[in-house]
Amino acid sequence: MEESMEEEEGGSYEAMMDDQNHNNWEAAVDGFRQPLPPPPPPSSIPAPAREPPGGQLLAVPAVSVDRKGPKEGLPMGPQPPPEANGVIMMLKSCDAAAAVAKAAPAPTASSTININTSTSKFLMNVITIEDYKSTYWPKLDGAIDQLLTQSPGDYIPISYEQIYSCVYKCVCQQHSEQMYSDLIKKITNHLERVSKELQASPPDLYIERFNIALGQYMGALQSIVPLFIYMNKFYIETKLNRDLKDDLIKLFTEHVAEKHIYSLMPLLLEAQSTPFQVTPSTMANIVKGLYTLRPEWVQMAPTLFSKFIPNILPPAVESELSEYAAQDQKFQRELIQNGFTRGDQSRKRAGDELAYNSSSACASSRGYR
């Protein structure tokens, strides 16, 4: 008897739990459907108390309930509104995200060590002002010395890649101002020594030595300016609004050319009056170089500059044609006095005539055979 009662109680409890789970499943499905029509007025059916979200999970008395609906006389609890089901779903998703976050591995010590290592490497690459003065500038100083004193065509045993890298690192470490100051000071000291050597030169070697100094310096600039291109781009052009090449040319003008122009120009005019006292290439290099340094110096000797630089003099005037012809005749007489003859005025040269005659004779002899 007791066993049958226990079985009936167990069966009723299981049926109640099945019905409860079925009702919960139907409520969850109805939450995603379209909302039901509004309930009848409160006068006909009393409004039951609204249960909080999840109230369906609370224990209820064991009552036999049909699976298809409640029995007569037992009111059915209200359906949870869609909003409550949405909140439940959102809470479940948040709980799932929190569970994933908890399951994610915490940052290990190796990642922290890698960050610290990269930071320490960055700090180790910092170039202090002491490092610049003791390591980087001495390399640049030695390379500049070799470039300024090289002769045209000489091989210089320096690494352009190493010098370029030194300049790049110093610019990145904010040493551009100090490097530019050291470069200007270095080249200024070199040009002052060159000027003193020219002052001690005798007159017969003065023009030739000035030509060597000018050509050597201009050739050195073709290597120095590209090596300091980063300093020129990110410091001189942006902060000083100038160009490195213009600054270095100005140094030669101020420290060498301006100090020697009044001694050099009379010697150039004298050499011009005496043909071939100075080679034409030397004369052309000096005149073109002076015009590059300071175009205003053309006014000191317009005739001299006009022989090597076009369009210096004003255009010819018809009234001065006789004067131009007289100058040309004078120049031709000077050439004759120095051993230059006019020679044969025909288009053929003597050697060509002999070669033509011999070839024609050979052809005729072959034809008769």
From Swiss-Prot:
GO terms under biological process: G1/S transition of mitotic cell cycle; positive regulation of cell population proliferation; positive regulation of protein kinase activity; ubiquitin-dependent protein catabolic process
Region (Disordered), start-end ranges: 1-56, 342-369
Gene designation: CACUL1
Stretches with biased composition (Acidic residues): 1-11
UniProt-recorded Gene Ontology molecular function terms: protein kinase binding; ubiquitin protein ligase binding
Keyword 4Fe-4S: no
Protein task: Cell cycle associated protein capable of promoting cell proliferation through the activation of CDK2 at the G1/S phase transition.
Official protein name in the record: CDK2-associated and cullin domain-containing protein 1
Entry comment describing in which tissues the protein is expressed: Ubiquitously expressed with highest expression in the mammary gland and large intestine. Highly expressed in cancer tissues and cancer cell lines. During cell cycle progression expression is high in G1/S, low in the middle of S phase, and increases again in S/G2 phase.
Swiss-Prot/TrEMBL keywords: Cell cycle
